[in-house]
């Protein structure tokens, strides 16, 4: 009997500034170039999703964040690989300077901006979750309801 390959576990950050979320466009040298996503990366062996996200955001963007609460976990088949994306609402602890090793453009997106962006497929379920909030700033209230 063949063993099923485990999904690739990746994490993405919901970084809020008022009622806007920082979204990032994948750079030309990355897979799915030109598509928008929530910045993040792979969960390494022995890491919690929160630890992985805090490490990835620091490595790629030079930002210090604090993970607050998971917004969405969904599995998406991309080519022949299943991607499990866990999107986590985070607090941004340092100012964003506009740098990332994996992205070529950034946008502080309003809720109204989200549907018009061309998203990486694994991020779409979380985008749908976000569209269900009256105001994106409500995510912080949602995050503190532990």
What are the residue ranges of the model-derived segments?
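Short, charged/polar surface micro-motifs in flexible loops or helix N-caps
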Residues: 16-21, 29, 44-45, 91-96
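Active-site-adjacent beta-strand/loop module that shapes the phosphate/pyrophosphate-binding cleft
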Residues: 8, 74-97, 107, 111
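Short coil/turn segments
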Residues: 26-29, 119
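Conserved N-terminal beta-strand and adjoining loop/helix that marks the start
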Residues: 2-22, 42, 73
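Nudix hydrolase/Nudix homology domain
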Residues: 33, 97-146
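Conserved beta-strand segments that form the floor/walls of ligand-binding pockets within enzyme
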Residues: 22, 37, 87
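The catalytic Nudix box helix
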Residues: 38-70, 110
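Short solvent-exposed loop/turn micro-motifs enriched in small/polar/acidic residues
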Residues: 5-8, 69, 99-100
């Amino acid at each position: 009997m063949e063993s099923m390959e485990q999904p690739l576990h990746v994490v993405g950050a919901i970084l809020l500034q008022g009622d806007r979320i920082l979204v990032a466009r994948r750079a030309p040298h990355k897979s799915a170039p030109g598509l928008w996503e929530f910045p993040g990366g792979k969960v390494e062996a022995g890491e919690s999703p929160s630890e992985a996200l805090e490490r990835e955001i620091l490595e790629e963007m030079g930002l210090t964040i604090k993970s607050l609460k998971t917004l969405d976990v969904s599995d998406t088949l991309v080519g022949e690989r299943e991607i499990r994306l866990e999107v986590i609402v985070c607090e941004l602890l340092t100012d964003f300077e506009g740098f990332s090793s994996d992205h070529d453009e950034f946008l502080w997106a309003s809720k109204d901006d989200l549907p018009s962006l061309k998203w990486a497929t694994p991020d779409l379920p979380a985008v749908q979750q976000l569209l269900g909030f009256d105001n994106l700033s409500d995510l912080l209230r949602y995050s503190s309801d532990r």
